[in-house]
Amino acid sequence: NICSRRGLSERFDSTIGAGSVLMPFGGKYQLTPQQNMVAKVPTLHKDTDTATVMAFGYNPKLSAKNPYMGALYAVVDSVTRAVAAGADYKDIYLTFQEYFERLGVDPKRWGKPLSALLGAYTAQEKLGLAAIGGKDSMSGSFNDIDVPPTLVSFAVAPLSASHAVSSEFKGTDNLVFMLSPKYDENNMPDFESLKVLYDMLYMMMRDDKVNLINSAWAIGYGGAAEAICKMSLGNKIGFEFTDCCDKSELFKAKYGSVIIEVKGLGATGFMGNDINVTKLGHTMAEPCIKICGENIPLDDIEKAWTAPLEGVFATKAECENAGMKKFEYGERINIRPKITFAKPRVFIPAFPGTNCEYDSAKAFERAGADADVRIFRYLKPSHIAESIDSFADAIDKAQIIMFPGGFSGGDEPDGSGKFIKAAFENEKVRTAVMELLNNRDGLILGICNGFQALIKLGLVPYGEIRKAESNSPTLTFNTIGRHMSRLAATRIASVKSPWLAGVEVGDIHQIAISHGEGRFVASPETIAEM
């Protein structure tokens, strides 16, 4: 249960809304899985530092053996993960997802959800936290197969985006400690000790002057060993355990314990009688993990971690042409607009299924433009006619058209951007677009689904709306055969476009991508012409 699931995670959009604070996988190499989701609260015209954190907890093996302890630790795990990201535990609210076998009239079966609910309630009562809402199902049986007793706890809290803490190691020669609450003989945490630990972590993360904690990991199923390995992978920063490290302790699931990476701080800086502090070791430049005289290369750890599900949720594609031709076009075209405006007007058409018109408008407003978002309505024929007139009017008043991304028309029929294409091929709209380009030196930009529309309309690469031919350029399915959502290192190959006036050929930028059809295909002649 601790192997890599990156191939599955990348199928889901992690950047939509332009509010993500933490990506699902952290570090330069995007290999350290984050234990929580942190995103800014969406705002239309202003920016904010207010964010929310959401984390979950559940151990199916523990819950199958002891539903009470499984649910109790689900709550503890979810809360600890949220605290490790920078949340104040007192601000946390919980919600539960319960799933149990069909109960029937068997008292033992009825005892499982009752036991789990008592365990969750015990943790809530001890921590002073309430659960709001949730969902339950008692139909998890098929013939003689039953689901394990399931109570998944979700912890949700507000926090400052600027104080959010991610999980990957940030630097070398930093000390790494494990902070643990006290446990009784049944491995039950002392909740008073746990609350002291939570308060201490929050105080250390909030202190801007000291900035003690570089990274943090809430220990779970795989113990400290899992934590150290995964924290090392994101930036390929090595780790050396202390000489007195007890290997047997490293694989224990110490729910409620947190591993922290600190800089320039001795253990005395946060020792107390109410929690246990263990120095695990220090980070180092050498990309390996050293323990008891043994060196384990991080590359070997990465291979072992990614191998189990690679055949199911692939992260690498088999390509016939592994080499990629390098294109460069360094000559700039110095074009000045015929008409200048203090605040350019940007028309952003919103279609059914598009989903980033708000953040596109916000980005343009931040850059000094006025955004005009108009919705294409299609419930009745009269609505379509009104939308066509509205779009043509908006284009006549604009200097820029911005096509937003998403899934216009549900990417039907059989392809992306066709709904946008159909609307902009209308004679009124097409005439307005070409007048903007040819007579007013207008600009057009497209992202995701909107870029698909630019290509299908012929605006890229021809600069005019034209009918597609059999050899027209297109965007087609990713070689890996699935949706991709991650940050991609993208090299600037040309500065011919006015949109690239602020960059140079060869510059590399980390660009958020999220698409299933991201592969540009064109004939050699078209490529040469471009």
Which residue ranges define each predicted feature?
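Short, surface-exposed beta-edge/turn micro-motifs
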Residues: 173-175, 255-258, 398, 487, ...
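Amide-donor transfer/coupling interface in amidating biosynthetic enzymes
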Residues: 280, 386, 393, 434-435, ...
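Glycine-rich nucleotide phosphate-binding loop and flanking beta-alpha elements
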Residues: 223, 266, 408-409, 451-453, ...
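N-terminal beta1-alpha1 cap of cysteine-dependent amidohydrolase-like domains
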Residues: 292-447, 451-462, 476-484
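Intein/HINT protein-splicing elements and their conserved insertion hotspots or analogous self-processing inserts
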Residues: 1-51, 55-63, 108, 113-114, ...
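Short phosphate-binding/catalytic loops that engage adenosine nucleotides
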Residues: 87, 275, 369
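Short hydrophobic/aromatic beta-strand micro-patches
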Residues: 259-263
